[in-house]
Amino acid sequence: MFNPLSVAIGLRYLRAKRRNGFISFISMASILGIALGVTVLITTLAVMSGFQKEIRDRLLQMSAHATVSAQGAPMHDWQHAVALAMTDPRVAGAAPYIESEALLQGERHQPAMMRGIVPNQETKVSVLAQKLKVGSIDSLKPGEYNILLGKELALWLGVDVGDSVIVLLSQTQTTPVGTMPRMKRFTVSGLFEVGYNEIDRGLAVVNMEDMQKIMRMDGVTGVRLKLHDMDHAWDVASDLAVRLNGPYLVSDWTRENANLYSSLKMEKTVMGILLSLIIAMGAFNLVSSQVMLVTDKQADIAILRTLGLSPAGVMRVFMVQGSLIGIIGTLSGVIGGVVLTWNLERILKLIESTFNITLLPEDVYYITGLPTDMQFPDVVVITLMALAMSFIATLYPAWRAARIQPAEALRYE
């Protein structure tokens, strides 16, 4: 497409000093605009991807990859379901669970999800034992009515290890004074911290047998599965439900938090589209600078035409020159984006310590720190998009240059 002569002249125009200094300024602004857009876009998408990955990982530390639960009634033969699940080589662990919404009362009230577990089996499907800041998962012994609370939940309730909390379940019971919610006093035996505010403030864990007693329940809600490859969660859970041969409900990690993952993906897409406008502005500046360059080089174009360069050759010259500006801006932006992403958390900590401010409040953004996950496909797409915009921006100025008539251009020289 580009012959050596077009490339040589295009490179010469890129390095040459312009008679009009304003053209050089606009060309530099084009490079900076494209570079800034690429840098900001790479960094922002890396942060958005980092948030997605961090939230997903922290959720899955306490949540199952997949669940199989009984439909409309407790699952009674859960031991058989766990044993059957473990025969699947794709399953790393399986454990029974009971879940119910509850209202916890300490110095204050707070709704939370209450989960009943078997301690020695829970370690196969979650990292609860490793996330305990105080206490041990072995403290959840049947009949002792101990409870593990998220650190933020305990702080809100105003309780600590050794204190008591009253748990009110959504199930009701009939008493001499009327219908009352089921309630029981538990002793706080440990505090856990995952680093995800929704869990640290919204989950309480007790022994499964204790929960069965206060709920008058002789089965479990279902079985939780941890897999070697969580991308196969739905298939594995569906296969287990079929093998159990009953009316079971199947869910996996993508469906349990579908709204959250969808909103995060949408935010990343919208942010990418909006920030692409910065690159578009740089490309628009490139159009302006190239049009002015064509006007400035009319005499040169006329001489080239009289020496035998075709209109297509003239067009290629300015396409090469403009594309090189785009390439320089894009590569500068890619380098800047990669370097900024690698050092972003360090920069934010420096800003926070210098101005004594908190840029990312934990209670707002759910997680601590600023995670980044720079994905190669994102960088490739951004690079190709910037190069495409730059190339398209050269077409109109190059077409104008090709239309210049030598006689008209040299008339007033």
Curated annotation (Swiss-Prot):
Cell compartments where the protein resides: Cell inner membrane
Q: Name one GO biological process term.
A: lipoprotein transport
User: Keyword Cell inner membrane on this protein?
Assistant: yes
Q: Where are the transmembrane segments?
A: 22-42, 269-289, 322-342, 379-399
Q: Which Pfam families match?
A: FtsX, MacB_PCD
Membrane topology per the entry is: Multi-pass membrane protein
Q: Where is the signal peptide, in residue numbers?
A: none
Chief subcellular location? membrane
Example of a GO cellular component annotation carried by this entry: plasma membrane protein complex
State the family named in the UniProt similarity comment for this chain.
Belongs to the ABC-4 integral membrane protein family. LolC/E subfamily.
| Role description | Part of an ATP-dependent transport system responsible for the release of lipoproteins targeted to the outer membrane from the inner membrane. Such a release is dependent of the sorting-signal (absence of an Asp at position 2 of the mature lipoprotein) and of LolA.
Protein name (database record): Lipoprotein-releasing system transmembrane protein LolC
The organism encoding this protein is Xylella fastidiosa (strain Temecula1 / ATCC 700964)
